[in-house]
Amino acid sequence: MSGPVTGGCQCGAVRFSAQALGRASICHCRMCQKAFGGFYGPLVTAHGLAWTRGRPARYASSNLVSRGFCAACGTPLTYEYDGGTELAIGALDDPERAAPVIQVNPADKLSFVDRLHALPWRQPGESPAADAFMAAVENHQHPDHDTPTWPPAKGMHP
């Protein structure tokens, strides 16, 4: 996971670059579940982190950890502790560069997580209403690459 990486929040107000990534993990602790609004927290150690647009707001989720997030759109961005910073894998422009290699805090893992892969997929055509809704969705989030300015001119979303 070496080489420079970039990423940022959903609205584009906060952007970062890291010189390299370290270990990627899935954390099942209850604090990560709440911070990510999901079943677990996907995180990767960042080396040489720099904020290239804006800066995250922070919340002290415990006596040892602060979590960075975009104050404008709420995107979770960091897990910060004495000695290191981990980035939210989903905030990377290319999350495929940070495939998790370990899971931590198994005592808090939700009981159904190991069965998610077996859930059925809704295929195109099975729900015309859902297909129509998805076709009408217009993406307003920041693209997965650095931009010189953001947001773009009114009406010029990606």
What would you call each of these model-derived segments?
Residues 1-8, 13-158:
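A short Gly-Trp-Pro
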